[in-house]
Amino acid sequence: MLNDFYKQFKSGTDIRGVASEGVEGQSVNLTDDVVADMADGFVLWLSKKVSKKPSELKISVGRDSRISGPHIMKITTERFKRCGAEVLCCQLASTPSMFMTTVDLGCDGALQITASHHPFNRNGLKFFTREGGLEGSDIEEILLYAQNGEHPEESNGGNITDVDYMSDYAKGLCEKIKKEVNAEDYEHPLKGFRIVVGAGNGAGGFYADKVLSVLGADTTGSRYLEPDGMFPNHVPNPEAKEAMDSICEAVRESGADLGVIFDTDVDRGGAVDSKGNEINRNRLVAVAAAIALEGNDGGMIVTDSITSSGLKQFIENDLGGKHYRYRRGYKNVIDKALELNAQGINCPLAIETSGHAAMRENYFLDDGAYLCTKIIIKAAQMRKEGKELDELTASLKEPLESTEIRYKILEKDFRACGEKIIADLTKYAEEQDGWCVADDNREGIRVSFDRDNGDGWFLLRLSVHDPIMPLNVESDSEGGVKTICDKLGEFLKTTTGLDL
C-alpha cells in the first residue's frame, strides 16, 4: 500500500509533483532520487508487462517545454540506460507523439515528461505502452516499486540515441491532410488558407512550421510558438478564458480563416472559426462528432457528463448518431468507447469538453494535433463546396445562460461527504414539482427543469481527484440560471460539509 509521500504523486493515470522552486509554500518533492526511483519502477513494471528483461526493452522519452524537463529527461534516460535498455531521446515532443513511437519505432514503452497545463514549477511522468496510456492501478504499482526501493539489475548494454521523431510525426499529419483534401495542388492543399496557431509557449509550435506552412498555409499572426517553460503569456489551456481570448483575437486581427489552440503537451486542442467564434467545449464536441459520424451512420459518441442538452439533440436528431453521456476524466470516456466497440457497438469518437478527443481511426489516442488536423481537413473540403466551417454546426442549440460553481468540501473524508449529498439530493429532487432527474446520467446527479422552473438543467458531481463538488448549470431562458441555482440552494443550505 502506498504511503502518504508516494500517494501525493498519483494524479489519476499520471504522476505529478513539484519539480522546481519558485512558488511560495510549494517545496520540490520530485527530487532527483525520487524521479530515479520512479524511472526504475517503470522499467520493472514494463518488463513484467511485455515479458522482456529490462536489458531487452526499447523505451522512448520526450518532454514538454517546462523548465525542469531537460533535467528530468537526463535522470530518466540515464536510469533506463543503466538497466541495459535501448533509449530513444526525443527531446521536445508532444504527448501523443510519444505514444506513436510505440507504433512507428517499435518501442515497448514511452515516457512523456509533462504536467499538462499546470504551473511552471510542476512536472510529471506520463507513460505509454502499445496498448495506450496506463491505468491508475498501473501507476500505483510503479509508485510502489519506487517506495519499496526496488531496482532492475544493472547492465552495461544500454544506450541513448537522440531521435527527431517530431519531424516524422508532423510528416504523417501532412500526408493525411494531402490525401483527404486531395487538392488540385496536391502538395499544397492549404494554399490560400490563413490559419493561426496558439501554442501557449508549449510543445505545439511545430504545428505552424512543420505542418501548416509546409502545406501552403499562411500562419502569419500565430502566437507564442516558441517553447518557454515559464509560460509568460497565458496558461496553455484551451479551457482557460485568457487562452481562448488570445487565439480569438489573433484570428480577428490577422483576418484568418481558422485558428487552432493547444495545451502544453498537445493532447488537447480547440479551434476558432473565421468570425472569431470559439470552437471549444460543446461546439468542439459537435464539430468532432459531425466529422466522426461521416461513414459511421448511427454511430455512438461518448462524452463526459457536463455536455449540454442541445448537444445531445444535435448528435441524435441532426447527425443521426447516438450520444452516450459518461463521466469526467478523459481516460474514462476513452475506456468506455473501447468497451462499447468491444461489444460490437459502432463508436468512432470519445471526447471530453476539455478538448481531449480520441478517434477510433487513430488508436483512440487523445491527440490535439490530430483533432485540429481533422477540423482543418473538413474546413478545406467545405471550402471546395463554397461552404464555411461554421455551417457544420449551424443547427446546434446553445444555452442562453450557463455557469459553473465549484464548492469546496470541508470534510476530511470528502468522497463520503460528496456521495451523501448526491444521494440526499436525488431523493429531494424526486419529490419536487418541475424537477426531472435524468435517467441516463452516469456521474453525480443531473436534473432538468421545465420552463416555469428555470428552463434548463444542473449537474452536481464529485471532482475526479479533488475535494470539490463542481456544479454546472445551463438555461434557455433569461434569468433561468439564477432560478435553478436558487432552487438548488434551498437544498444545499440543509447540507453539512460544503463551503457555500
What are the residue ranges of the model-derived segments?
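Conserved phosphate/anionic-ligand binding catalytic regions in large, soluble enzymes, centered on
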Residues: 7-24, 199, 203, 349-353, ...
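An N-terminal, well-structured beta->alpha segment
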Residues: 1-76, 82-83, 159-195
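Short glycine-rich phosphate-binding loop at a beta-alpha junction
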Residues: 54-64, 88, 194-196, 299-305, ...
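N-terminal small/polar loop signature for handling phosphorylated ligands or for N-terminal nucleophile
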Residues: 44, 48, 52, 58-122, ...
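Gly/Ser/Thr-enriched, mixed-charge loops and adjacent short helices
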Residues: 123-254
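Phosphate-binding and adjacent anionic-ligand microenvironments
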Residues: 296-472, 477-500
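Proline/glycine-rich low-complexity loops and linkers
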Residues: 81, 90, 143-175, 274-353, ...
